[in-house]
Amino acid sequence: MPTRVHPLLGAFAALVFLFLLAPLVIIVGASLSDTTYLTFPPQGLSLRWFANIFQIEAFRRTAITSLQVAFLGTALSLLIGVPAAYALNRYRVELPRWLSTLFVLPILVPEIVFGFSLLKSITIGSGLPVFPSLILGHALLVLPYSVRVVGASLASFDFSIEEAAMSLGCPPLRTFLTVVLPNIQAGVIAAFILAFITSINDVSVSVFLTGPGISTLPIQILAHMEQFFDPTIASVSVLLMLVTVGVMAIIEATLGLTFLTK
Amino acid sequence: MTKLAKWGLPLPATIAVVVLLIIPVALTIATTFGEAKGAFSTYAAFFNSGFRRAVLFRTLEVALITTALSLVIGFVTAYVIAQMPGRLKSIMIIAAVFPLLTGVVVRSFAWLIILGKNGIVNDTLMSIGLITEPLSMLYTEGSVIVAMVYLFVPLMILTLTGVLEGIPRDLTEASASLGAKPIPTFLQVILPLATPGLIVGAVLVFTGSFTSYATPQLLGGEKQMMMGTFLYQRAMVTFDWVGASTVAAIMVVITIAIVSIMSRIARRLNPMAV
Amino acid sequence: MKAARFIQMATVISLATLGGAATASAQSKTFTISWWGYNGEKMNANIIEPFKKICDCNIVFETGNNADRLNKLKLRDGKGVDVIYLSDSFSQQGIEQGMFKEIDQSKIPNLKEIYELGRAPQGKYGPAYTIGRVGLVYDSAKVNPPITSWNDLWRPDLKSAVSLPGITTTAGPMAVIQAGKHAGVDPYADTEKTFKAVEALKSNVVKNYNTGSELVNLISTGEVRVAMAQDFTLASMQAAVKTMTWAKLKEGDIATVNTINISKGSENVDLAYKFIDFILSKDVQQKEAEQGVDAPINTKVQLTPDQAKIWTYGAEQVGSLSLISYSKMNAAKTEWIDQWNEVFGK
């Protein structure tokens, strides 16, 4: 049941969206330009920089790796992060305070130092292959989102509802899935989105964890840009937005777009 | 049962952080104490340099301003979004995420087009006669902050919308029906309940902006060097990992201090905040 | 610490068995090349596929920029790759860190066909496989009189018009060397006077760039009119601003080379020699040059004037260039970075 929003607040939000979306107009424009350099307004319209993404084999290959890593890494981080977030809120009084700080550490340590240390002591120390270490590194990198963003949603959850369900004989896991989870759904989805995007854009950690035969899309894009200064990079950004819109359209058609919210 | 859940549920994530992050990073940072000139010599060298202190203070300043601006902008926007009907709400959330999908190089190109000497802002201001000479807006602390706020407002919106949604509407309505004006309702009901979200957002934005290096480098240049760029130079250009780890250790200590101050403030506003 | 180490290993091993099954185990004969990763299609057609027929092996790449790959090679103690492509200042760092094998020139017959300058640019280590220049570019429509000397960088009419390569890029330290020459001192010996000259440049500098794409953006948006640049960026700058011109400097340009080295831990040394010999051969160099990938260093490559115009090409041009002393430069680099930060950071 929406309530009325003060016009001043509404106007402020509109300005914020203008601020957020205006640079995107420039990026979309630049991606369509028929020039070998980034320019705005675009000079001549062309889709060749989009075609370029699909024609270069290294982009296709690394895009698949990036998607796999982002998906598995995010899933792994939610799998271990959500239970931690739950415990931190459910047993807030009993658990030590430093525990919640612990889960911010992965974004608190500068990424290249994290990547360097991980490569030095884990991958090389134990001979772990490149692909699993990439996934582990990404899962840890995005863990703060899984724990803290979900945790923020749990903070306003009324745990007495859960107790009521359990006292009526509902087993704990089922209680969590049917009573707790629907109430923090927006938080879990926000965490997933933030984690996924962080993982798919990551350069600093991936730089160290990729190895012979395995690379990720952002690193491949940087490699391309060592030599070419064309709008391919803008096209990649636009393509990511289009994919997002596409995924949303599918969700809209199947589940209804209100899934993001309660 | 409770005891098992209490300690068992956070265990996998705790082990992951300890094994994959704390031990490896501690081993790296331990190298900074092994210098021949004494255990803390690299740290003394850092703080003895006026230039490095200036970089540290600038980084703190930029990160704090970015955090404050992102908090206010993100909170108000998330509040408005949370009031919207379901479908529009989802569309707005998706739109807010779009800036995060752009790479840093194209994003800074867009700012070049907007804030540059021949950019849109300067052109507009000149054509309406407000200025006669183009303003130098790029490569200032301001341009770095604008670009960082741009990147962190979406994160704040995403974090806070979920939290504001969770505040039971009947609570605010009850407060209003009891005759409370909007501002007291906001201060006494909404703000305390949103505090956990605000603090999580603030922590994520502060740590993110404090450690960033690509945005300050592209939009600030050398005049606005920040700790992340400085660390990057040490690690990836001179291969001086002891120096880089020193910078990292200083950054970690400062961030932990700031994060715990933030948590303390949050607990004062709302004792339930983690 | 022991317990921690144990937990660490146990976790890693259990996770490895879970996730590691997905990655195939190494083949018996795999040749690993570390290089940048751009122009993959042409590299594949011109070099990789033909070489596979020679070596009868699998070829795997590690990609990334100079610093990333050299850092990783060092962390692995010189193992994991067989040959590594690097730009000159980074290969010098790799040499100083003991990451490469010394080269036995008799195993690379094609060395005799390449320019003298490229055969052993860094002592007993890997040869250069391509050559380029660092010089000045300027917008001839807006900069008058034209740029004819490195000293023109200090001209008062170029206030807020210049971009230099950042000190941490390949060409960055060369800006310092030119500043030393401008001040009439040896930059390695008299850091103080050298950086006085760098400081005198500050009011002319809008922003220093860290990547080629950043430079092209600065030029195309009109933020910058004069830059110190590497030749391979010229074509893109001219596409954006037609009047961008490569300055004819009376002191001449500075040479830069990209090298290829055999890593210390290579397990396929014979193949590595064969590979290096192959990429220096006339046929490969000819194809790479014709397709705009790399400037040729093999003296037998023949290009039409049109093909040659984007490259440093021909005995006369190559002869006019000189290499800088990488070992001296790397020794000074840490100090220079600090000084540079102080000058431009204020």
PLM features: what roles do these ranges have?
Chain C
Residues 20-26:
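Sec/Tat signal peptide C-region and signal peptidase I cleavage site
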Residues 38-44, 80-81, 85-223:
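Extracytoplasmic ligand-binding site segments that recognize negatively charged/polar headgroups
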Residues 89-93, 220-221, 225-243:
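A ligand-binding cleft/hinge motif common to bilobed small-molecule-binding domains
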Residues 132, 196-201, 209, 240-264:
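Periplasmic-binding protein-like
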Residues 305-346:
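Extracellular/periplasmic bilobal clamshell ligand-binding domains
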